């Protein structure tokens, strides 16, 4: 099944602790916890585009597998990032900076399970295709 499409956040576990460990400020954390963002995935040849859309903030990363790029992390810091693919449907994103963050997006049919880790804190968020 192709991964392109739109997915809505259905379930979020431990996301507030993940944001705490990352050092996200109170106002941003409060807003982020209450939102139900839409994940939009687009594939343009060998370039992938992942967008997170919400009423509070929209973000986008555009990348080619294995190629380093820069992005603004959730705490506002500019970091170097690399995304690799494992199998057909699992994308492993590593953000390098003062803290290393790993974000795994596992596309499972109509669901995307996003596991984000920083330090010894892990958050799991599940999105459903819309």
Swiss-Prot record:
(5Z,8Z,11Z,14Z)-eicosatetraenoate binds at residues 105, 125-127. (9Z)-octadecenoate binds at residues 105, 125-127. One of its GO terms (molecular function) is lipid binding. Pfam families: Lipocalin (PF00061). The keyword Transport applies. It is found in: Cytoplasm. It comes from the Eukaryota. Coiled coil: none annotated. One of its GO terms (cellular component) is cytoplasm. InterPro entries: Calycin, Fatty_acid-bd, ILBP, Lipocln_cytosolic_FA-bd_dom. Keywords: Allergen, Cytoplasm, Lipid-binding, Transport. Forms a beta-barrel structure that accommodates hydrophobic ligands in its interior. Belongs to the calycin superfamily. Fatty-acid binding protein (FABP) family. FABPs are thought to play a role in the intracellular transport of long-chain fatty acids and their acyl-CoA esters. Binds the natural fluorescent fatty acid cis-parinaric acid and oleic acid by competition, but not retinol, retinoic acid, cholesterol, dansylated or anthroxylated fatty acids such as dansyl-DL-aminocaprylic acid and 12-(9-anthroyloxy)-stereate. This is Fatty acid-binding protein. It comes from Blomia tropicalis.
């Amino acid at each position: 099944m192709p991964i392109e499409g739109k997915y809505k956040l259905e379930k979020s576990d431990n996301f507030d602790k993940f944001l705490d460990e990352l050092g996200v400020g109170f106002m941003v954390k409060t807003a982020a916890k209450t939102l139900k963002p839409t994940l939009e995935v687009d594939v343009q040849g060998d370039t992938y585009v992942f967008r997170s859309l919400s009423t509070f903030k929209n973000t986008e990363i555009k990348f080619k597998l294995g190629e380093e790029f820069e992005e603004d992390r959730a705490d506002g810091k500019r970091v170097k990032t690399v995304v690799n693919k494992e199998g057909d449907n699992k994308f492993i994103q590593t953000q390098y900076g003062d803290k290393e963050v790993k974000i795994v997006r596992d596309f499972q049919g109509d669901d995307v399970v996003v596991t984000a880790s920083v330090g010894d804190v892990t958050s799991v968020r599940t999105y459903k295709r819309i």
